[in-house]
A protein has these predicted regions:
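Major-groove DNA-recognition helix of helix-turn-helix-type DNA-binding domains
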Residues: 35-69, 85, 90, 94-96
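Polyanion-binding surface elements
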Residues: 12-43, 78
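Positively charged, aromatic-accented nucleic-acid-binding surfaces
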Residues: 1-21, 63-97
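Helix N-cap / beta->alpha transition motif
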Residues: 27-28, 56, 71-74
């Protein structure tokens, strides 16, 4: 099991499973709308492919036209990592809570 999957907290993953009705892969446009509303879908894809946003994009087929999405475990891991970074930043500014 990779470290990324191990870092995912069960509550985050379970909440996302409930939010997306148990889907394994969430369409990229939905992820964009729900979590990256300040970006267009195209800009989100570019940032992910460049590595600016560490979120793996899944294509079900090798075709360039295949639908793109984000695996639920990857999304949960990304959210948990962003939360951990925010907590570290807060603790540096305000001291541990």
């Amino acid at each position: 099991m990779s470290d990324d999957v191990q870092m995912t907290s069960a509550p985050t993953l379970f909440l996302l499973m409930a939010q997306y009705c148990g889907k394994t892969v969430v369409p990229l446009d939905v992820v964009c709308r729900d979590f990256f509303g300040h970006l267009t879908e195209r800009k989100l894809l570019q940032k992910c492919l460049r590595g600016d946003i560490a979120l793996p994009i899944v294509r079900i087929e090798t075709s360039q036209k295949a639908a793109r999405g984000v695996h639920l475990s990857d999304l949960a891991s990304y959210i948990d990592k962003r939360r951990a970074a925010a907590i570290r930043e807060r603790d540096q500014l305000c001291g541990p809570q």
